[in-house]
Amino acid sequence: MQLTARARRKAPLSLPFDIAGLLARFGLDLPGLLTDSNPKLEKGAALARPAILHHLPARALAAAIDPGNGSPVAPRGYLPELFALAEREGLTAAARAHHGCPWGTAACIAGCLNWAGHGGLSPKVAAARGRRTLALLADPAAYGRAVLWAACRQWAAAQRDGLALALRLRGTDDTAWHRLRFDLSPAEAIALGRRFGVTVAPGQAVTLAEAVAPMVAAGSWINYDYSKAGLGGPLGLEAQRAAGWDLTASFAADRATACRDGLAAVAAGFRLAVPVALPKGAPIPSRLTISTGAAGFVTVPCIDGDATDHRWADPHGVGVILRTKRSRGAGPAADPFSLAPIAEPQALADGTATLHW
């Protein structure tokens, strides 16, 4: 008997053997890989179906498997189940060496949003993000394909709602997804199409963006992200954009080159996400000026980055104002992460930033 397309998509999901095995080893499942609902994502649900991937940021995986980590904030502390998993899988050394935010500054790492909201309350959230991170370290190619399968599942749900999928892979880290490559066989591409109705491009050593390029071209799939990377080089903002991602540059106020990097990003046509310690309900500034003195300055209009997370829908060359969120366990070391909500010029390491109301 030949199944209809609808019946195939309702049938039990049969994943490729290596993907199914990887997920099982790390206590993961396909529906749980991506987050498709939280208060901010829901704000933009009418624009596109959002899906976001969360890993542990910076050196948080190393901290989570350190028995000597006595953090009073449980999600920032020692997670014995993660340590046991890393030991069992032979990943302890890799986990201790892992840095999920290679361009993160001290204040950014201290005040990371990984520990804001639900992520700051439940060790179970940190453990799930840790298991995903360990799976990435164990087999990057199989994990990349697992994320592709999970995202195709989200795309099918978006299509049922008459929406595009907006996929963000760096929810709480800065992994170089434009450099993560995997082999996608014609048979697997056909299986994805039969199951989810997607059109993916098979190939050897493809990125996720290359695999889903037909749907991006059709307007039904959007890859977007934030990054604190610099402008140039194989890991930089320009390389990420060229690889198929809609990028928003993240302003690092406590970086030695904060103003120069901000100027360069705006000049290259990127949006600039700027955290500001605004009280809830306070109006955002209308403009932002970044100056490096002799090297020049730029003034850009500002938009409210808390209205939705869909940065891809915002114009480029703007300041995206993000109200600072409380990160549980963050101390004074996190304060330089945000600009103060004042109209006077604020001195940074290599210039000034001025908010205008």
Language model features with spans:
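Class I S-adenosyl-L-methionine
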Residues: 1-357
